[in-house]
Swiss-Prot record:
It is found in: Cytoplasm. It comes from the Bacteria. The keyword Ligase does not apply. Gene3D superfamilies: 3.30.2130.30, HUPs. This is Probable tRNA sulfurtransferase. One of its GO terms (biological process) is tRNA 4-thiouridine biosynthesis. Its EC number is 2.8.1.4. It catalyses: [ThiI sulfur-carrier protein]-S-sulfanyl-L-cysteine + a uridine in tRNA + 2 reduced [2Fe-2S]-[ferredoxin] + ATP + H(+) = [ThiI sulfur-carrier protein]-L-cysteine + a 4-thiouridine in tRNA + 2 oxidized [2Fe-2S]-[ferredoxin] + AMP + diphosphate; [ThiS sulfur-carrier protein]-C-terminal Gly-Gly-AMP + S-sulfanyl-L-cysteinyl-[cysteine desulfurase] + AH2 = [ThiS sulfur-carrier protein]-C-terminal-Gly-aminoethanethioate + L-cysteinyl-[cysteine desulfurase] + A + AMP + 2 H(+). It is an enzyme of class 2 (transferase).
Length: 380
């Protein structure tokens, strides 16, 4: 008998012919998450993934809770396919639940085992009642559900720790997120990562109008997001010269939308260089002037790559709730301005016309900035 972590996954089981690809990617991501743990073994057999961890089990569980594709983690007992060994495992597991009501549920994928599920449940329950003090059976509303799985070995567990869910990172291609340092864009990145998308980030830095602390904030956000993946690459684009060009030569009410279009063009160029097939933004419909449906239409027309906006139908409270859950909120609210909050016009256009925007852009030579932007790449 030994202790293992039993990894449960949801959507992967529905992937048909591609199932092994998703499972193997999940195994790779689990190994990466536990890469600095000694004596860790990760094994995939018959629709289950098992993790053996000699020490620091609680820390291992905390790491695994951030691995996309895992819906649940259980601390399980692994026993030989022998009833007496199964009884010992059940008693050992249930000693920490003395005085509670319980129910035993058995699954028997291994049909070669000579006892059916009902018989295993009955016998395991009897062993618990005999050897653990003050236990009572309640088949309708038990305090503890003791699960028994009969596979190549027997696995027993009670209780499931919730995982991050979603799909394993790296199973749905790559995209590039425009990361501002605010509340929204890190949440948008996290939501796409949850769908299996590998993410690189672009941050637009405008010194001296934005400080190094603003850049450090974005680096810290990437560090949090990287805990859900396999590291992250951050592209820091120096945006001051192009931003000044916009505000000197374009109508004030159009400067915000034109700035967004220039950011999209530069982000698209970076995305195409790093193999991304889409851009990600943290825009939510109607939240600010640049996020009306008319503004988003004009913004989209600046690029050819698809633009994913996972927050588009969410309100601010919903976004903040996720930011707090994933650990980015306290970083995002640090009081350092990003380039989107400087030079903001008093009355930005909320329903810009594409032809008017294109006409305004002709007044400046933006292409030279896009072709020759200064970039710093930070590996996180």
């Amino acid at each position: 008998m030994k202790d293992v972590l039993l990894i449960k996954y949801g959507e992967l089981a529905l992937k048909g012919e591609n199932r092994s690809f998703f499972e193997n990617t999940l195994v790779k991501n689990i190994k990466y998450a536990l890469r600095d743990f000694d004596g860790v073994k990760v094994e995939k057999t018959h629709g289950r993934i098992y993790v053996e961890c000699e020490k620091d089990v609680e820390e291992a569980i905390e790491r695994l809770k951030k691995v996309f594709g895992i819906v649940g983690i259980t601390r399980a007992k692994e026993a030989d396919l022998d009833l007496e060994e199964i009884f010992k495992a059940a008693v050992d597991l249930m000693k920490s639940h003395q005085g509670k009501t319980f129910k035993v549920e058995t699954k028997r994928p291994n049909k070669a085992f000579p006892y059916n599920s009902m018989e295993v449940s009955r016998r395991v329950g009897a062993a618990v009642l005999k050897n653990v003090k003050n236990m009572k059976v309640d088949v309708h509303n038990p305090d503890v559900l003791l699960n028994v799985e009969i596979r190549e070995k027997a696995f027993l567990y009670a209780g499931v720790i919730e995982g991050a869910g979603g799909l394993p990172l790296g199973t749905n291609g790559k995209a590039t997120v425009l990361l501002s340092g605010g509340i929204d864009s890190p949440v948008a990145a996290w939501m796409m990562m949850k769908r299996g998308v590998e993410v690189e980030a672009v941050y637009f830095h405008s010194p001296p109008y934005t400080s190094d602390r603003a850049k450090e904030k974005v680096v810290d956000l990437c560090k949090v997001l990287s805990q859900y993946g396999r590291g992250m690459r951050l592209h820091v684009v120096h945006f001051t010269d192009l931003q000044l060009e916009i505000y000197e030569k374009c109508p004030a009410r159009l400067t915000t939308i034109i700035m967004r279009r220039m950011m999209m063009k530069i982000a698209e160029k970076i995305a195409q260089q790093n193999g991304s097939l889409a851009l990600i933004t943290g825009e939510s419909l109607g939240q600010v002037a640049s996020q009306t449906i008319e503004s988003l239409y004009v913004t989209n027309s600046s690029v050819s790559l698809p633009v994913f906006r996972p927050l588009i139908g969410m309100d601010k409270r919903e976004i903040i709730d996720i930011a707090q859950k994933i650990g980015t909120y306290e970083i995002s609210i640090r009081p350092y301005e990003d380039c989107c909050t400087i030079f903001v016009p008093k009355h930005p256009a909320t329903k810009p016309k594409l032809e008017k925007v294109l006409e305004a852009e002709e007044k400046m030579d933006y292409q030279k900035f896009i072709d020759n932007f200064e970039e710093e790449v930070i590996e996180i």
